[in-house]
């Protein structure tokens, strides 16, 4: 199971391991939890939620220090795209995903007809999030969300999630006892946050309830609805592996920059398999491991993967897995040896980027969008290929000023 949405609150859950530097200051709020929970009850009532729902859902809730410990224990480990994709897009997961594409073909076809999201995309998320429903979590969601909303780190993020979880019960979609999921409050086959569930949940089996935990039709259709919310466009591609030349203008390899496929073709970019139409379809060049690693054209629909999970490696892996389920062969490792930076090297790099004026972000050991952007600026300053991928060579240049 991979917790995902909380990345929007500054945490890339699921792509992390213990790191004291990320844990932040201790926070002791447990003594006043009952009084705080009374405030949540009042807020929920003001939002139109009945006292019966409030009591049923929040009555059994107690502060769980184990949830806080898990949250505090989330730090960073570095995995490259090839490492993460190699682990997550395993032969077993390919086999089971392919089998589900066949056994659930009728359902997936109806969902695609309604929402425009292809079956391989939904099955890819289903596999990555809960291993096709086999690991949906065991934590009482109201206890998890109340604990995280009360904790001092991100109350403004989790408190609305708690209120939206109450809305789900109020609408009759699930009972409080059925609201069981990940320790961070996500639920169901597709691991939806309560806010996403309440906004994008779909009753696709026609029983009058939107049940993303127990109903596969509801869960998959809700996932498709959520992707549409994140900008998915019917009938458009999302990711295509390509080969890149040695003399490409690397500063154009940026998700914020799009060019027509015809322009990429003029620069020597070619499809890794099949052909690359030299047309006006816009695409960004995605280099998850720099110019010597795998290369993809990321189409506008790739933004829906980033909407689902802002963690760059996860989003790329999900999109790649969907292409594999669509029939694409395994990705090429690229053109040359790549030595990923360690977590300590990333922290040093980030500190140097701040010192040299390329960034204002506090070093945290994570290679996120801000670090990649700062790396690109530094590469351009020092005359290095500006592919946004951090290297030991760049660290040496930054050390020297």
Outline where the language-model segments fall.
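Low-complexity, glycine/alanine/valine/leucine- and proline-rich hydrophobic stretches
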Residues: 300-301
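Sec/Tat signal peptide C-region and signal peptidase I cleavage site
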Residues: 19-23
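Short acidic, glycine/serine/threonine-rich helix-capping segments at coil-helix boundaries
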Residues: 339-346, 354-398
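Mature N-terminal segment immediately following signal peptide/propeptide cleavage
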Residues: 29-56
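N-terminal secretory signal peptides that target proteins for export/translocation
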Residues: 1-3
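A general alpha-helix detector
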Residues: 36-43, 107, 144, 349, ...
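Bacterial N-terminal signal peptides
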Residues: 8-18
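Catalytic glycan-binding domains that act on GlcNAc-containing polysaccharides
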Residues: 49-280, 293-296, 305-322, 327-343, ...
């Amino acid at each position: 199971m991979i917790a995902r949405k909380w990345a929007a609150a500054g945490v890339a859950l699921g792509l992390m391991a213990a790191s004291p530097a990320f844990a932040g200051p201790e926070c002791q709020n447990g003594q006043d939890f009952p009084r705080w929970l009374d405030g949540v009850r009042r807020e929920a009532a003001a939002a139109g939620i009945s006292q019966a729902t409030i009591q049923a859902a929040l009555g059994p809730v107690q502060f769980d220090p184990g949830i806080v410990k898990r949250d505090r224990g989330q730090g960073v480990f570095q995995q490259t795209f090839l490492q993460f994709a190699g682990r997550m897009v395993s032969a077993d997961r390919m086999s089971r995903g392919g089998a589900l594409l066949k056994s659930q073909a009728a359902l997936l076809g109806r969902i695609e007809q309604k929402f425009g999201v292809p079956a391989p995309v939904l099955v890819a998320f289903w596999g990555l999030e809960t291993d096709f429903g086999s690991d949906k979590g065991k934590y009482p969601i109201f206890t998890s969300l109340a604990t995280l909303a009360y904790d001092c780190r991100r109350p403004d993020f989790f408190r609305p999630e708690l209120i939206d979880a109450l809305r789900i019960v109020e609408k009759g979609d699930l009972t409080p006892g059925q609201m069981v999921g990940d320790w961070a409050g996500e639920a169901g086959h597709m691991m939806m946050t309560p806010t996403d569930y309440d906004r994008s949940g779909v009753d696709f089996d026609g029983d009058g309830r939107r049940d993303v935990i127990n109903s596969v039709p509801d869960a998959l259709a809700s996932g498709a609805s959520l992707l549409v919310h994140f900008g998915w466009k019917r009938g458009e591609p999302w990711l295509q592996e390509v080969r890149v030349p040695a003399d490409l203008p690397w500063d154009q390899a940026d998700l914020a920059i799009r060019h027509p496929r015809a322009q990429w073709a003029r620069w020597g970019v070619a499809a890794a398999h099949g052909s690359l139409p030299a047309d006006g379809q816009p695409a960004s060049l995605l280099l998850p491991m720099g110019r010597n690693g795998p290369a993809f054209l990321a189409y506008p629909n790739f933004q829906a993967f980033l909407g689902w999970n802002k963690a760059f490696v996860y989003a790329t892996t999900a999109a790649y897995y969907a292409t594999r389920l669509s029939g694409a062969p395994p990705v090429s490792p690229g053109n040359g040896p790549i030595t990923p930076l360690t977590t300590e090297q990333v922290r040093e790099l980030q500190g140097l980027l701040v010192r040299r004026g390329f960034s204002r972000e506090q070093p945290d050991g994570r290679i996120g969008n801000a670090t990649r952007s700062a790396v690109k600026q530094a590469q351009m300053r020092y005359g290095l290929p500006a592919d946004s991928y951090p290297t030991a060579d760049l660290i040496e240049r930054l050390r020297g000023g």
